[in-house]
Every structure is written in structure tokens, then in C-alpha cells.
Amino acid sequence: MTDEKLNDHTVKAPEYLPDILTVESLDMEAQGIAHRADGKVVFIEGALPFERVTANVYRKKSSFEKAVVMAIHRESSQRVRPACPHFGLHTGACGGCKMQHLHVGAQVAVKQRVLEDNLWHIGKVKADNLLRPIEGPAWGYRYRARLSVRYVRKKNAVLVGFHERKSSYVADMTECHVVPRHVSDMLVPLRELIAGMDARETLPQIELACGDTVTAMVLRHMEPLSSGDLARLRAFAVSHPGLQWWLQPGGLDSVKLLDEGVPELSYDLPEFGITMPFKPTDFTQVNPHINQVLVSRALRLLAVQPHERVIDWFCGLGNFTLPLATCAREVLGIEGSEALVARSCQNFKKNQPASQSRSALSATEFVARNLFEMTPAMLVKDGMADKWLVDPPREGAFELFKSLAALHQQMVTGVPCDDGEQQQSLVLGDWTPPQRIVYVSCNPATLARDAGVLVESGAYRCTLAGVVNMFPHTAHVESIAVFERG
């Protein structure tokens, strides 16, 4: 993977004269929003709310314009000096962060507004109350990352890091403040390692995954590695204790350890006495500090009682399922992947105490189900549950909530719901909808859409909603919402 340029490309000169504008707010991409006298919207990179700035417009459309801040005439009290020298609007700036120039408390406020705006404008939903934001360390939090690799033949140099802002080029990074310190300290040695490898031109990326005590790096290689390269990787691991190399010659199913017999990756949920083993290609939360607080908060919001049955939808490896098994009578974890279901079962068995030193986990079952093709009949088949925990990917849980709303309508009106195959009344027996749902979301737009389905049906109201600052200094909005039946 060669690149004949080492961040020496120039910025295209602006096509329009600068304008002085007053910034009103930030959008979901952390761009300042201003309006011209005629009402036309201008999105300004690098500008903050309440600032008065000179902005260079570089793109004009009929309904909006794009600009970049050139000078600040009135500065926001929330503007701070970025911690990282690679952050900014300059040529070659890293695109991994978007908000380092904004105080972290103000970042959370912006994300809260984004959540509320999405709930209202997309779902026509307004939460009864706002949750206190879940916050944690602002730096060194990112335990998962995909680092791009580029060999620059003319310079005989290697770049390892995130992409440049608004570019496919790899940023010339020597440090990173959002990954753990020991990973940041490895960036320059990694560049030197790869520059000396025989396969340096065919190594496109490194997938980073940190556990509590082990750091895994998955090296994607497009051709077989020489014995010399394997020896170089092993020597690098020896010089960086706790590091293990995984190799990926093809798709995800090709990932394997360079050397067996090393400690497994895992993270702890100490409040619940749970240890979660995982592989570097598994989905785990990027921010382990926030994850611990999020799991604790979600279970408190569910308020699970010892006699209750709970379903954990999109359960993954059991991040919420196993803690739920410490307090519920019975738990059902449902996931789309058969492989993940098998791994969840393994994690459950590993955490089931062999002695009486602590309480056993409750009866827990894991099943595979295509959650993007849910029907009312499938919901009834999974049985009644007192509470639900829903933690979907960015696509959300639309079919799940649509099926739940349809069953509610059948119960209220007696009109048959569409079970996806035939139009007929389902025999519900003693099935009833869950009394409470806690929804953990990584996309406020799909959360708002799904919330609208529930609330419009008349079955539920949104009692609580709030943000989870899982990704400080980025525009990513993680959130949590609570829905109460009746």
C-alpha cells in the first residue's frame, strides 16, 4: 500500500470571499451553524456557538453553504486549547477527533441537544425527564481503534494512524491522546517496525483491541509474511510486554494468533463479579470505563426484581446479559449471529461459580434470531418478559418495535396484526408486553425513529433519556432511553 505523497498536498484556495458570521449552534458533525440575513444556512468548520468569525465559503448549494473558520473576532468561553498537536484545520490534521477545541462539558451539552432534537424532529417524542449524562475520562479512553498503514516509497517512511481530516490520506501521527498511553507510545516504534518489514508495501491496517491487561494488534497482510517479518513481529512483542500479534491474511474468519499460549483478552465488570473474554475482532465497547458505568446504570433503570424474566435483545457476548443474570429469575439473550450465541454460552459458563463463595447466575439461555426480520409471531414465541434491554447496532431495532406495537394494537382493538406471513389474530395466551424497556443506542436518529413507533402506538411513553459520552472529542452520540408501558 504505497502513497507517493507524505502529507505534502496543498489546500485548494477558497472560491468565495470571506464573510463575517455569528455562530448559533453546532450540528451533528461538530460544525458551527450560522444563518445569512436571507435565512440561508452556513456550516462552518472549527467555529463554536456564540462566536463571531470570519469564514471562507468553499462550497455553495441552493439551500446551504460550507465554510471553514479563518479568524475569530469573538471567542466562546467554552473554547479550549486542543491537547493533541495533530488536531486542527491545518493541512494534514488528523480526522479522528472533531471537538478537542470545545470544553468536554460543553461537548456533552451539545450531544444532549442532538439527542433531544432527534427524538422530537424524527420521532415526535419528548422524554418526561432527562438523565444525568454518563461521563468518564476524556483522554486515553479508546481501547479499540482501526489504524491505517501507508508505506511512502519516496521517503522510505511509514505512516500509522487515523485518516486525515476529510481525506483518504493517513495522518502523519507520532502520538494520540485518545488511545491508552502505552498505545500512543508505540506509534513511532510501529512505524519503524513496519518500515523494516519485507511486506511493508502490502500492510493496509492494524486493528487495535485492548483488554484490561492485554493489548492485541491484528495485522492485515495482503501477502504471506516472510520468516524474517514474523521474527520482527515477535521481537516487537517481546519489547512491549502485554502485546500480542494476530494475523489476518483474508476475511475476519482468517484471523489467528501469531503464537498460541498467550493470555486471553478480557475485561471485567467488577460490580457484578463478571469477567468477559473476547477476541480482537469481536464487538466490545470502545470505552471500558464508560461501559462499566453504562451497564450499572442500565440495570438500575430496569430495576429488575428477583422474580422477573428479562430479555436482552442484540445481546452480543453477554455484556448486559450476564449482569442481568445476577439479579433476575431468568434471562434470555437474543443475537443475530450463531457464532456469537456460542461465545455467549461459553462466557456464561466461565462466569458460573464452581463453588458457593458467591451466588450462581440465574437460568440463562441464548438463541440466534434475525432481529431485522422480527414479526409479532416471533415475539410471542420468545415468551413473555417483564423487562427488556435493547442494545442494537446503528441500524436500530425498527422491526422489533414495530412488532411490539402491532401486538399492543391487537390486544387493545382485537384487530389482527400482520405477523409477516398471514393476516390473522395471534393466540397470545398469557403473553403481555414488557412493563419497561431500556434502550441503549449508538445512533440518535434510529433511536428516535424506534421511539416514535412505540410512543405513537400508545403502548409506551418515554420517561427518561440522556447521553453517554462514550467517545469524547468526537461527534458520536451514544444514548440511553427508558420506555414505560401504560
Curated annotation (Swiss-Prot):
UniProt KW keywords: 4Fe-4S, Iron, Iron-sulfur, Metal-binding, Methyltransferase, rRNA processing, S-adenosyl-L-methionine, Transferase
Residues noted as binding S-adenosyl-L-methionine in the record, renumbered to the chain: Q285, F314, N319, E335, N370, D391
Enzyme Commission designation: 2.1.1.190
Annotated catalytic residues: C442
Location of the TRAM domain: 10-71
One MF term in the entry's GO annotations: RNA binding
InterPro entries, sorted: 23S_rRNA_MeTrfase_RlmD, MeTrfase_TrmA_CS, NA-bd_OB-fold, SAM-dependent_MTases_sf, U5_MeTrfase_fam
Catalytic activity: uridine(1939) in 23S rRNA + S-adenosyl-L-methionine = 5-methyluridine(1939) in 23S rRNA + S-adenosyl-L-homocysteine + H(+)
Entry binding sites for [4Fe-4S] cluster: C84, C94, C97, C176
Example GO BP: rRNA base methylation
Chain's role: Catalyzes the formation of 5-methyl-uridine at position 1939 (m5U1939) in 23S rRNA.
Family: Belongs to the class I-like SAM-binding methyltransferase superfamily. RNA M5U methyltransferase family. RlmD subfamily.
Name used for this protein in its record: 23S rRNA (uracil(1939)-C(5))-methyltransferase RlmD
This protein's encoding gene: rlmD
